[in-house]
Design a protein with these regions (language model features):
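Short solvent-exposed beta->alpha transition segments
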Residues: 24-28, 42-89
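A generic structural signal for ordered secondary structure
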Residues: 32-36, 59-64, 122
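Exposed beta-sheet edge and beta->alpha loop/turn motif
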Residues: 84-134
Length: 134
């Protein structure tokens, strides 16, 4: 039985690309924040922001106002789909394709950093209209 479990673990580890668990964890954090925005739950949305972001926006309501004003497609949208991701030494960069409430396409690039407790938190989000040069 122990051999079967070990074999299964080895097969799973070869089936997943390097960093796949980090990408899955990052996507879970981003999705949880997106859902918090949808519920207008400022405290929950704020909890996924890294400490450096929380220093800039020291209150959940201030953070939520900033997102509403500067990241409207992230705050409210028709679709929110994960794209390519990159993992490097405790950091994850995750692209997200967004269609806003008006039907306009956007691309967001989220960055996340591993925290001392092992969790990932969002360190930033860059937002461009789809097709716009960086």
């Amino acid at each position: 039985m122990r051999t079967v479990v070990l074999l299964a673990a080895l097969l799973i580890s070869f089936a997943l690309p390097a960093g796949a668990t980090d990408v899955a964890a990052a996507q879970k954090v981003i999705r949880a924040q997106e859902q918090a925005f949808a519920r207008n739950d400022a405290a929950a949305a704020y909890s996924y922001a890294a400490p450096a972001i929380q220093e800039i926006f020291p209150d959940a309501e201030i953070f939520m106002q900033m997102v509403q004003q500067s990241y409207a497609p992230v705050y409210r949208h028709q679709s929110f789909e994960f794209g390519e991701a990159k993992v490097s030494d405790g950091y994850v960069a995750q692209r997200v394709q967004i269609v806003d409430e008006n039907g306009e396409a956007w691309e967001a690039l989220y960055t996340l950093e591993e925290q001392p407790d092992g969790s990932l938190r969002i360190t930033g989000c860059s937002l461009l209209k789809a097709g716009q040069a960086v």
